[in-house]
């Protein structure tokens, strides 16, 4: 993981957190609600600026950010009955402020996708596999396969998109040493049917001597309407995949807990993208922005969704729950959230390749 690639990924993550907090901040200020603090990160401030009413800061622990209101400050000079305190506003006004961070992340993700599809384009996965290379004198070459062919089906089984297509292709070939298999390929505008007999390797498994790549189609908008349409399709697909992923995590947490990624893992993933193809940082940013929105809307303490639950209860009961109870729940949730963040940072840091290589020599163990 190169330093520049890591910095690019960190920059993307920082921008997305800033967008989320700016959503809360803008929703409050546009309604005339007092805001005392706008912070990126938690813990002691690294940089700080005091505005006319609001303190702006970048803090040491990069696990999120927050917008603070004088309602939470017992030393605030603003009268408790000030109509522009958040707590004195109607439920709808407060709900707008609380949900604005999620909305900001979703809107920003959509505009990132518009930016990508308008300038670079999307690479959409299509069914089948591309053959970029055919080994000399291999079973595939003998059968007439050529570089650039797109494999559509094997043994009458239509290939899905990547990565399932790769798994299916390799499985069929390996299980068929010295057994002819029928392969349908697309070559230019033509469709051809080839019969390939995999040769056994040293382990007795079949091989045909080709390299495999995903079959991708680059979509680039030629006008504003196409940009909006393509971006909407990509946005819908990412939201659907994200919500499905969270549902699988929640419904089968024991098996999927190891897949939960913290900031370090996200930065590593983003750095790999930046190193291989920086243009994909648009889509990476949109993906993480949508993930931030989905995470924050979950009805859990210390998250925006948890605060919306309190508002819902207030609307049903006609009065808010006791303030001490709400504060206790939120503080407990914040401690648990920070603890989870620290755990994920430590775990993901220890799993980084260069750390894994460093630890044996540092500890003296092999």
UniProtKB/Swiss-Prot annotation:
Q: Which topology term describes how it sits in the membrane?
A: Multi-pass membrane protein
| Entry annotation: catalytic residues | 21
Q: What is its EC number?
A: 3.4.24.-
Binding residues annotated for Zn(2+), in chain numbering: 20, 24
UniProt keyword annotations, A-Z? Cell inner membrane, Cell membrane, Hydrolase, Membrane, Metal-binding, Metalloprotease, Protease, Transmembrane, Transmembrane helix, Zinc
Family of the protein in this entry: Belongs to the peptidase M50B family.
* Record's protein name: Putative zinc metalloprotease slr1821
């Amino acid at each position: 993981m190169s330093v520049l690639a890591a910095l690019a990924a960190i920059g993307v993550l920082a921008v997305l957190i800033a967008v989320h907090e700016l959503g809360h901040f803008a929703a409050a200020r546009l309604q005339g609600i007092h805001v005392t603090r706008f912070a990126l990160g938690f813990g002691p401030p690294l940089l700080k600026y005091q505005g006319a009413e609001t303190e702006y800061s970048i803090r040491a622990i990069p696990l999120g950010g927050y917008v603070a209101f004088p309602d939470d400050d017992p030393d605030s000079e603003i009268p408790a009955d000030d109509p522009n305190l958040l707590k004195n506003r109607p439920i709808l006004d407060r709900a707008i402020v609380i949900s604005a961070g999620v909305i900001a992340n979703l809107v920003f993700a959509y505009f990132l996708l518009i930016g990508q599809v308008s300038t670079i384009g999307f690479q959409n996965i299509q069914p089948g596999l591309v053959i970029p290379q055919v080994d000399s004198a291999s079973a595939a070459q003998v059968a007439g396969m050529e570089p650039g062919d797109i494999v559509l089906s094997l043994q009458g089984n239509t290939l899905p998109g990547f990565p399932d297509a790769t798994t299916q292709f390799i499985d069929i070939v390996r299980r068929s040493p010295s057994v002819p298999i029928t392969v349908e390929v697309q070559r230019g505008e033509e469709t051809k049917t080839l019969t390939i007999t995999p040769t056994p390797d040293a382990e007795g498994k079949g091989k045909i001597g080709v390299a495999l790549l995903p079959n991708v189609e680059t979509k680039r908008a030629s006008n504003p309407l196409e940009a909006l349409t393509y971006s909407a399709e990509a946005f819908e697909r990412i939201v659907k995949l994200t919500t499905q992923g969270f549902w699988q995590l929640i419904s089968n947490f024991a098996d999927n807990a190891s897949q939960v990624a913290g900031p370090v893992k996200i930065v590593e993933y983003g750095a790999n993208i930046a190193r291989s193809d920086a243009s994909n940082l648009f889509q990476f940013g949109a993906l993480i922005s949508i993930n931030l929105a989905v995470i924050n809307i979950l009805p859990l303490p210390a998250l925006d969704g948890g605060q919306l639950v309190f508002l819902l209860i207030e609307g049903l009961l006609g009065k808010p729950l006791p303030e001490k109870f709400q504060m206790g729940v939120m503080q407990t949730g914040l401690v648990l959230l920070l603890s989870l963040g620290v755990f994920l940072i430590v775990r993901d840091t220890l799993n980084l390749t260069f750390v894994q290589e460093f630890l044996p020599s540092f500890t003296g163990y092999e």
